[in-house]
Amino acid sequence: MKVGVCCHDAGAAEIISSYVMQKNIFPLYCLSGPAIKVFERKIGTIDNIPLLDIVKNSDWLLCGTSWKSDLEWNVIKEAKKQQKKIIVFLDHWVNYRERFIRNNEECLPDEIWVGDHYAEKIAKDNFLNVKIKLIENPYLLDIKEQLLRLGKSRVESNSFLYVCEPIREHAYFQHGDERYWGYTEEEALRYFLTNINEISKVKRLVVIRPHPSEDFNKYDWVFDEFNHKDIKIDNKKTLLEQILGSDIVAGCESMAMVVAILAEKEVISSIPTDGRPCVLPHKEIGSIRDYL
C-alpha cells in the first residue's frame, strides 16, 4: 500500500521521518516549511508533490499538525473527501484540539498516534470519538540509539545550551495576544541570562540555539544587554551534538529539553515567575525559581 506523508513543522517531521526510516517505508511526500530540511537531513532529497496528488495517489496518509500552516489541516479535509484513511502523529503535549480547527471548522483524522502515556491520556481526554494509538516516539527511539552509540557525554564542559522556541508568535496566532501565557521568548531568555549566576557559580559559555522556524538573528539583542564574550548563537551542529557538548540545558517548553533528559543532562525551565508553569510533564525538569 502506498503511504502519503505530509508535514510542515519540525516537531512532527522529526517523529514521522524517524518512523518512515524505522519501518523502511518509501512514501509519497507533501512537505513544506521546516519539515523539508528535517526529512532531507535524515533521508535525502525529497520529491515533493502537490496536496491533491498526494491524497489521490496514496492508499492512506500519515501527517503531523501545525500551529501556523494549514497544510496538514487541508490534507485531512481532502482525505476525508476522497475517503482515504488519514492518521495524525501528534508531537508535544499541548494545544491538541486547536490543531484541528481552522476558521471555527474542526477537521479530525480517522486515527491519532501519540508517543507516550502522557500524550495518550491528553489525547483520549480531548478526542472521545477518535481512535488513539500509542506508538513509542520514533524520534526519541532514534535519539536513544544514537546515545548508546555515542555514549552519554558526562564531560564537564562548563557550558549552557539554551533552546529557543517562537512562543510570542504562537500565542498571538492562536489567541491574539503575544503574552497570552504570561511571557514571551525574549522575556524568558532575559530572565535566564539575568539569573545565570544563581544557577551556577561557575562561569560558563552560553550557547543559544534558535528554533528551526526562527530567524538566526532573532536573538542578536542579547549581545547589547549582556556580556557577549560568554554568549554565542549557534545552530550549525545537530541538536544532539549541542546537548552532548553542554552540561546544563535550559529553555521554556521545547522538545529539545526532553532529548536533554534522555542524555542525562540537568534541564531547567526558564519561564519567568509571571508565566504559566512549564507544560512538559517530565518531573526531571527544574525551574530557575528553584535557585532564587
Predicted features and spans:
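Short, well-ordered alpha-helix to beta-strand connector turns
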Residues: N57-S58, Q83, L108-D110, S157, ...
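Generic structural signal for residues in well-ordered beta-strands
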Residues: P27, I132, V206, D230-I233
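Active-site and donor-binding regions of nucleotide-sugar-utilizing enzymes
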Residues: G4-E145, E165, G251, A256-V258
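Nucleotide-activated donor-binding/catalytic signature segment of Leloir-type glycosyltransferases, i.e.
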Residues: D220-N235
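Leloir-type glycosyltransferase catalytic cores
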Residues: Q146, V279-L292
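Conserved catalytic-core segment of nucleotide-activated headgroup transferases in glycan assembly
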Residues: E14-Q22, L148-V222
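Short, surface-exposed amphipathic charged segments that create phosphate/polyanion-binding patches used
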Residues: E145-S157, I243-E253
